[in-house]
Amino acid sequence: MDSSRILKYESRLNFGSLCARRIRAKSEIPAVVYGKESDVLHIKIASNEFNKRFAKFTDNTVLILSDGKVERCVFIKDVSENITKGLIYHVDFYEVDRNRDIERYIAIKFVGASIGVKEGGTLSVLRTKIKVKALPLDLPEFVEVDLTPVKKGHQITFKDIVLPENVKLAEEDENLSILLVK
């Protein structure tokens, strides 16, 4: 397993504003883990570790929460922060079964300069996300689409996107255009 995904946590029994302030005073972040098939778990995580490693998370960032005994596969669902102070106040994690495929929308990252645009064409982006199906730990945070070979009058559809191994297209119509050059 990729150790960069692992985030250590400790369970906590005390809740409320006062307890949350005490946790933050110890350079920790109060958090909660919930999911469809699991009870709500109140935890605390090290602030510096979370800020350092996961400052630029996406909706598809998959983490492994570990207390040394139990590992939980989670997505970061929500982060409450004080922007003026630069502090994270609370994190919500959503637990999923790491052995079951899930469907998620992931970002499409366009790279390169289209030949058609260089010839005077106009690039129209119709979709910026794609629905895929994969195990949580195989889920990419984004897919890259190279625009370089796209000529004037051509388009790219969902089926043209090259997905990583173990990731399947979950769109209903794979022939829908994601971009075209006019």
Swiss-Prot record:
GO terms for molecular function: 5S rRNA binding; structural constituent of ribosome. Gene3D superfamilies: Ribosomal protein L25, beta domain, Ribosomal Protein L25, Chain P. The keyword RNA-binding applies. SUPFAM superfamilies: Ribosomal protein L25-like. Belongs to the bacterial ribosomal protein bL25 family. CTC subfamily. Part of the 50S ribosomal subunit; part of the 5S rRNA/L5/L18/L25 subcomplex. Contacts the 5S rRNA. Binds to the 5S rRNA independently of L5 and L18. This is one of the proteins that binds to the 5S RNA in the ribosome where it forms part of the central protuberance. This is Large ribosomal subunit protein bL25. It comes from Borrelia turicatae (strain 91E135).
